[in-house]
Amino acid sequence: MNGQTPTDGGILYDATETDDEDDLVEVTEAERPAPAIGWAESLPEAAGLKGAELIQAFVKRLPNGPGVYRMLNEAGDVLYVGKARSLKKRVSNYAQGRGHSNRIARMVRETAHMEFVTTRTEIEALLLEANLIKRLRPRFNVLLRDDKSFPYIVVTGDTRAPALYKHRGARSRKGDYFGPFASAGAVGRTINSLQRAFLLRTCTDSVFETRTRPCLLYQIKRCSAPCTNEVSDADYAELVSEAKDFLSGKSQAVKATIASAMAEASENLDFERAALYRDRLAALSHVQSHQGINPAGVEEADVFATHHEGGISCIQVFFFRTGQNWGNRAYFPKADPSIPPAEVLSAFLAQFYDDKPCPRQVLLCAPVEEQELLAQALSEKSGYKVSILVPQRGEKKDLVEHALANAREAHGRKLAETASQGRLLEGFAATFQLPYVPRRIEIYDNSHIMGTNAVGGMVVAGPEGFVKGQYRKFNIKSTDITPGDDFGMMREVMTRRFSRLLKEEGKPDRSAEPGEDAGFPAWPDVILIDGGQGQMTAVRTILKELGIEDCVTAIGVAKGVDRDAGRERFFAEGRESFTLPPRDPVLYFIQRLRDEAHRFAIGSHRARRKKEMVKNPLDEIAGIGPTRKRALLTHFGTAKAVSRAGINDLMSVNGISETVARIVYEHFHEDAAK
């Protein structure tokens, strides 16, 4: 919105704060809130001012209505995003010279510019504030970390034989969705057990449509093979219905039905069928055994409990849907130690539900700031009433206490890990004679098979362990690299990584000490390369070409004799290669870093290879979408058979016109035509 000013004195109102001019709406006189300043409107009388004086200059023009404000430093970085019932009253508090915490005082001192937007209601301001904090990540706000979307289980509803899949993201496909689950691992375990219990297919639609005989899953009793009609449509529909009932919380009824069928089969001396029902019951019991506590009186709720100690806050979340426990997850939001736990939890909740569906009940371990306002905002956003409660007795109180115990345990583990990580980083700095303890270490590795589907992986570690949100993969694109040339691949990875970093961040200032509120650095202090002298030469050449050889310390880790762990040789600038004692904690630390880079690179390579393996030549043809692709594969069986078909044969397929048939034919015969 830079450079945009309201026309005719109008206010720029932007409910989502985007930078596109088309998204700016000029509010009419009838809709207009109290006069205020748009995000980008400048204030001439504030020129040259900073801190409390600048804030005071803005206060004079602020309205008493609700809105959102942003504080920025001289570089234009957003320091803080806040909302207010009255912008004038809230912002004027910052202009007071006394009564501020050290955190607020530092923030005020750094403020060189402010931006504001008015909203129609305080609820609207709260929702906008949460959205902006998640996107802009101001360093003085409470920040939700590891905000990955939750996985669901979906039973599809748009095919003859519904399938069972893990799903993330928008619910664009027709079907029944169950969740959220706390982790992908929990979904995987549940689907594995549901396969044994209900024998539903998990294959892709294209595989399902083209199977001519049952796959291995049918042989090991994990699927009923509807693809080849090994099960009737009616029987498969019954299995699907039972699976939906189980996932909807009707587990006892489903188990009773299967137990009755098992008893009937046994009475009829059909012991093979009875054994099948027995195995299905065991699979369902296995699912429930992993769910832990399953409350009878809580149908749909999220349970939050927080524990704050040692400058670290832990928020434990349990997910209950359809009366079942779908798991729990611990979060460690980034927050200044001076912020009260109730304020941390309140800010966390607003950001947590910014892009996630909210249950009808949210149970908390303690009251939070503006609890009623938050409930109203979540209700308005969800389209149904959301209650935020602090239970005092009964089953719900027990759930909160259980979550609080888990929060304390997770917090204790985190404190121990952080302390251990700090000691290891200090030992790492001493071992490699670094001038300071590294705050960001990047570890690189390549993965490929004979040069095919080559991928470079970068993992990141810091004072709090691995920072998975910073991981990056690099699909090797150079065509002039000899297949299997690890040095060439590493050169490409280094060039792409640091060229972009230079463009986005500029050279790091190593002479300045990081500030007390400095976030996680963008530039690495150290890069670890999985390789020996050859890899190090390639890396140093690139760093020198980019002019950053003095900005980053590069260290090579060569595998030991016979590739034995514990016998690694290290290569660092300005000293001979060396090894570390087998029991040195720093050696174990480096091995853990290298193994994580190896795992990530191999996983990225396998994902790319799998994608290439299932890639269909029909996907490359313009005008061939999923429907026509399915029709062609159903008619001809394989893509190779499609490539051999003539135009008349192609036209015989339902939905393929002469024009489309010619496009398909010419795609596969363009070389012959030349």
Swiss-Prot record:
| InterPro entries cross-referenced by the UniProt entry | GIY-YIG_endonuc, GIY-YIG_endonuc_sf, GIY-YIG_UvrC_Cho, RuvA_2-like, UVR_dom, UVR_dom_sf, UvrABC_protein_C, UvrC
User: What Gene3D superfamilies does this protein's entry cite?
Assistant: 5' to 3' exonuclease, C-terminal subdomain, GIY-YIG endonuclease, UVR domain, UvrC, RNAse H endonuclease domain
Q: Which GO terms describe its biological process?
A: nucleotide-excision repair; SOS response
Q: Does the keyword rRNA processing apply?
A: no
* Protein's gene: uvrC
Q: Does the record bear GTP-binding in its keywords? A: no
What range does the record give for the signal peptide? none
Describe the subunit structure: Interacts with UvrB in an incision complex.
- Boundaries of every GIY-YIG domain copy: 64-142
GO MF terms here are: DNA binding; excinuclease ABC activity
Question: Which ranges carry the UVR domain?
Answer: 252-287
Q: Name one Pfam family in it.
A: UvrC_RNaseH
Query: For this UniProt entry, what is the primary localization, expressed as one broad class?
Result: cytoplasm
This chain's function reads: The UvrABC repair system catalyzes the recognition and processing of DNA lesions. UvrC both incises the 5' and 3' sides of the lesion. The N-terminal half is responsible for the 3' incision and the C-terminal half is responsible for the 5' incision.
Which UniProt keywords are present, listed alphabetically?
A: Cytoplasm, DNA damage, DNA excision, DNA repair, Excision nuclease, SOS response
Name of the protein in its database record: UvrABC system protein C
Record's subcellular location: Cytoplasm
UniProt family annotation: Belongs to the UvrC family.
HAMAP family in UniProt: UvrC
What PROSITE patterns does this protein map onto? Answer: GIY_YIG (PS50164), UVR (PS50151), UVRC (PS50165)
